[in-house]
């Protein structure tokens, strides 16, 4: 192998990791329009459109029927509310986030799930933390195809909040937390590891804004979600992602939005942030603290920088509140099909709302509220809202039925493997040479057992995702089959979940989408809208060309017309 090329590649990687970890202060003066100099993007993961409606208007049975998200409601008084907004399909966090920051669907981005499959790659050098086994890779040989792991499994140490990043503070998770030996490898590039930011096929809002001279920052839940930087990895100036699937630890100096100290672990009976209604509030508070620093013109570590032109984060608390059953505490979720929140979900919505109030106050303290466009949405929803519809079926799943017909790395027959791409959806890639119609026939014959709702394959899948396969001209990432089950059926088989996401159902995809700015008049849009429209709207609001986004150009994704109409008055 060419040594010079390896040295050059290593140097480029070092620059990428340095940029994603420490950032390089930039002058934002070249980015912005008359009314918008900054954009704040917030994803309240799991927040349905109806959740926002209920909390802003009140619903009998919660908070004495009074509204319980005053800060969100206040933003709506100078905002445009899109009540028929749809997230990505599949509605997993990874494609959901990519929709927001690229303007594209999985057809363009190549991101179907955080754990998916690529027919042109080979497996990692060492087994990932989530069980994707090490596999051979021969440089420039024909690939065998592999499951691709872009979640906590590629952390150096996913039990640690900092992801195991060497030399980093215990709470400082960044792209430096990624273990290159756990990454899928590309035989066509000499078996080089494929970093998350190079796994995505399109550029992102961060790359476009950074290239135009804007300072960029993002906060999320996995180091792997540094993929939002886009190809090359240089689109982000500051990235912060303490590992959400790490062990729960005390957070000295951090208080929840309601003022409760996180200096000691609030709920020591669980080991995961996502498993506790209380601990997840501390996890979110840690990241809100970082966002407040960025608004003040600092990096997430507190060192000096500038206020980003584009910044934001995701919140985890609402999704935990709507999907978790915590032993000894109670069930989250909803009390009925009208989306009346449980006491646990109610407290998570209230917690996030207070945090948003703190963030808005920080913008005002910095003197930039009047020229900041605030977009609040969700990567995904969660299904079912109606608690009587939930069916956890981890035995009769499409992947189980197909068994040896799917790659061993994905198969439930592999007891130590990472598992199939199944939540309240089943995304299936078949082994090379397997018959898709034969596999579909097996699924159809067992429709009742698997709670089959709809099968997408052939033209019904290719229409929106392209033609997948192993042959030249076929998309190596497009699945062969997607199964959406009946409403409420989930294939994870979890005993601690009462809802899930990833599917195409209304509850999975109808998410909150509110765009707020002091110059906007309140407006409700009932027409169908897609979260992919957020990306071109952000770029245009900052005075840049939305067509600079490759997915927007490829798919013809429009801006949110109502936002632009009011901003341009």
Predicted regions and their residues:
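Bacterial N-terminal signal peptides
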Residues: 10-19
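Metal-dependent active-site segment of extracytoplasmic phospho-/sulfohydrolases and closely related
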Residues: 350-393, 464, 538
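Active-site His/acidic residue clusters
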Residues: 222-223, 227-238, 299-351, 388-390
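Acidic/histidine-rich catalytic neighborhood
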Residues: 371, 375-433
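Short, structured active-site-proximal loop/turn typified by the sulfatase FGly-forming signature C/S-X-P-X-R
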Residues: 52-110, 215-217
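Short, solvent-exposed turn/loop segments enriched in Gly/Ser/Thr/Pro and often Arg
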Residues: 81-101, 219-229, 316, 552-559
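Catalytic-site neighborhoods of secreted/periplasmic enzymes
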Residues: 143-188, 193-259, 549
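Active-site neighborhoods of enzymes that stabilize oxyanions during catalysis
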Residues: 172-185, 198-203, 413-537, 541
């Amino acid at each position: 192998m060419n040594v010079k090329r390896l040295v050059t590649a290593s140097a480029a990687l070092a620059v990428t990791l340095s940029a994603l970890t420490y950032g390089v202060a930039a002058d934002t003066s070249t980015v912005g329009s008359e009314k918008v100099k900054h954009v704040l993007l917030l994803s309240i993961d799991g927040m349905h459109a109806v959740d926002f409606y209920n909390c802003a208007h009140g619903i009998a049975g919660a908070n004495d029927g009074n509204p319980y998200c005053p800060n969100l409601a206040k933003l709506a008084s100078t905002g445009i509310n899109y009540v028929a907004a749809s997230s990505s399909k599949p509605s997993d966090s990874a494609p959901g986030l990519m929709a927001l920051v690229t303007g594209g669907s999985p057809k363009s981005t190549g991101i179907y799930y955080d754990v998916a499959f690529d027919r042109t790659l080979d497996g990692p050098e060492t087994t990932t933390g989530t069980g994707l086994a090490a596999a051979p890779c021969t440089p420039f040989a024909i690939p065998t195809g592999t499951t691709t792991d872009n979640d906590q499994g590629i952390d150096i140490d996913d039990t640690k909040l900092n992801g195991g990043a060497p030399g980093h503070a215990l709470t400082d998770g960044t792209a430096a937390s990624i273990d290159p030996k756990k990454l899928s490898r590309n035989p066509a590039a000499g078996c080089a590891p494929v970093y998350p930011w190079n796994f995505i096929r399109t550029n992102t809002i961060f790359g476009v804004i950074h290239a135009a001279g804007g300072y960029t920052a993002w906060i999320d839940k996995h180091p792997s979600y540094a993929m939002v930087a886009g190809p090359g990895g240089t689109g982000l100036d500051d990235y912060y992602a303490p590992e959400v699937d790490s062990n729960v630890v005390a957070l000295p100096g951090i208080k929840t939005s309601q003022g409760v100290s996180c200096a000691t672990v609030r709920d020591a009976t669980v080991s995961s942030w996502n498993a506790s209604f209380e601990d997840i509030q501390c996890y979110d508070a840690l990241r809100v603290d970082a966002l407040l620093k960025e608004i003040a013109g600092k990096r997430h570590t507190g060192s000096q920088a500038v206020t980003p032109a584009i910044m934001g984060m995701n919140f985890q608390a609402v999704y935990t509140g709507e999907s978790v059953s915590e032993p000894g505490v109670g069930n989250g979720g909803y009390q009925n099909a009208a989306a009346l929140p449980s006491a646990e979900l109610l407290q998570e919505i209230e917690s996030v709302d207070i945090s948003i109030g703190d963030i808005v106050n920080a913008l005002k303290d910095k003197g930039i509220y009047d020229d900041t466009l605030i977009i609040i949405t969700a990567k995904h929803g969660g299904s079912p809202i109606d608690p009587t519809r939930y069916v956890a079926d981890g035995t009769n799943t499409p992947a189980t039925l197909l068994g040896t017909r799917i790659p061993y790395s994905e198969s439930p027959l592999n007891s130590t493997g990472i598992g199939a791409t199944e939540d309240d959806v089943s995304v299936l890639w078949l082994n090379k040479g397997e018959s898709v119609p034969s596999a579909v026939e097996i699924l159809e014959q067992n429709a009742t057992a698997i709670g089959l709702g709809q099968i997408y394959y052939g033209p019904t899948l290719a229409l929106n995702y392209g033609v997948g396969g192993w042959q030249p001209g076929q998309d190596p990432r497009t699945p062969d089959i997607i199964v959406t089950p009946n409403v409420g059926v989930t294939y994870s088989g979890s005993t601690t979940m009462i809802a899930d996401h990833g599917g195409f159902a209304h509850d999975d995809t109808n998410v909150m989408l509110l765009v707020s700015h002091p110059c906007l008049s309140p407006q409700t849009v009932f027409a169908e809208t897609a979260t992919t429209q957020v990306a071109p709207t952000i770029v245009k609001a900052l005075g840049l060309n939305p067509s600079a986004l490759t997915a927007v150009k490829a798919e013809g994704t429009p801006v949110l017309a109502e936002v632009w109409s009011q901003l341009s008055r």
